[in-house]
């Protein structure tokens, strides 16, 4: 009897140890709402159990704060853009991997002017945005398109959580932000969209970033997250009731209705299948895009004090490495998305 009790206790203990806990954080954005839905519908739990682990999915209202928490080790993975992955965790020395390339912004990020309709009218104005984020990058690309420089405007750092309310102030005349905030701002009187991310396709990617060391030690985490993601994608991308219900839930969670959420999806190049994501990840465009992003980051001092040039941090992809091969801190790894494409998860 004692042996049986000991055996059962050992089995229970081994089961408990096997269910290692991991934490993933996300913030509100059209391309990341599926994580909240997947957690609520227990899809993430299902895939975690399949691989003998536990995954807690946590929503954080402040986007930059979510990345900062990931960078200091509070979370194992976090949703963020390609630029922010480079300039926050990677630049801070945290070796990070793009586990999932979920989409690229195709109009979901934009520059809005109040009472003006041309980018050139922005000269001399204050521009509210999340400083040093992709909104700042978008502003730089917009200014570049009409021969202006950042010195022609004044950037006002504004949290995404406060953006809509602050834009309502009379003295605020320009803002760069992302959806759903962008659509809320555009609904206000005299607001004009003068530049958006559809004019720089593929340059603002939305990713699930994971700590590289954690992923290497726990491939089950990578498999569970990728498996859950593409199950959610298959549900929401259809035209049946299940798809409508899924997108309706995401719409409500992001503060809009189904029509509003579908409008945001229309300006997002969602990669609903792993094959679609792999097409970008395996392309020559990936590293050429990251070169532009790294150059912007270096010009703004975002790669750290030790960075002598834009190539200070190595960025690896299936086609090679941009930057310092001895200091790779951001990796685009197609391994797990390929497993999903091959139906081997």
Residue ranges and their predicted role:
Residues 20-157, 166-169, 173-179, 202, ...:
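Short, glycine-/small- and polar/acidic-enriched structural segments
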């Amino acid at each position: 009897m004692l042996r049986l009790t000991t055996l059962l206790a050992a089995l229970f203990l081994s089961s408990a140890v096997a269910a290692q806990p991991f934490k993933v954080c996300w913030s509100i954005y059209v391309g990341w709402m599926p994580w909240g839905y997947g957690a609520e519908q227990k899809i993430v739990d299902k895939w975690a159990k399949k691989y003998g682990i536990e995954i807690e999915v946590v929503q954080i209202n402040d986007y930059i704060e979510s990345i900062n928490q990931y960078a200091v080790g509070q979370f194992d993975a976090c949703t963020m853009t390609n630029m922010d992955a480079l300039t926050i965790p990677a630049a801070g020395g945290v070796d990070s991997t793009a586990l999932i390339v979920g989409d690229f912004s195709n109009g979901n990020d934009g520059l809005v002017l109040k009472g003006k309709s041309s980018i050139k009218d922005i000269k001399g104005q204050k521009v509210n945005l999340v400083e040093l984020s992709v909104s700042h990058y978008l502003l730089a690309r917009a200014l570049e398109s009409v021969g202006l420089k950042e010195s022609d405007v004044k950037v006002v750092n504004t949290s995404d959580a406060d953006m809509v309310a602050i834009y309502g102030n009379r003295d605020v005349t320009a803002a760069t932000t992302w959806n759903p905030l962008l659509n809320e701002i555009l609904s206000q009187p005299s607001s004009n969209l003068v530049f958006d991310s559809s004019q720089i396709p593929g340059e603002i990617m939305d990713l699930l970033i994971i700590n590289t060391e954690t992923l290497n030690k726990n491939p089950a985490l990578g498999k569970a997250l990728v498996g859950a993601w593409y199950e959610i994608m298959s549900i929401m991308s259809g035209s049946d009731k299940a798809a409508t219900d899924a997108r309706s839930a995401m719409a409500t969670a992001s503060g809009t209705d189904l029509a509003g959420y579908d409008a945001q999806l229309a300006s997002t190049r969602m990669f609903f299948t792993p094959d679609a994501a792999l097409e970008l990840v395996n392309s020559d465009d990936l590293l050429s895009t990251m070169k532009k992003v790294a150059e912007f980051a270096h010009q703004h001092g975002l790669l750290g004090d030790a960075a002598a040039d834009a190539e200070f941090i190595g960025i690896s992809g299936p086609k090679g490495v941009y930057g310092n091969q001895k200091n790779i801190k951001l990796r685009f790894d197609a391994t797990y998305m390929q497993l999903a494409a091959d139906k081997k998860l």
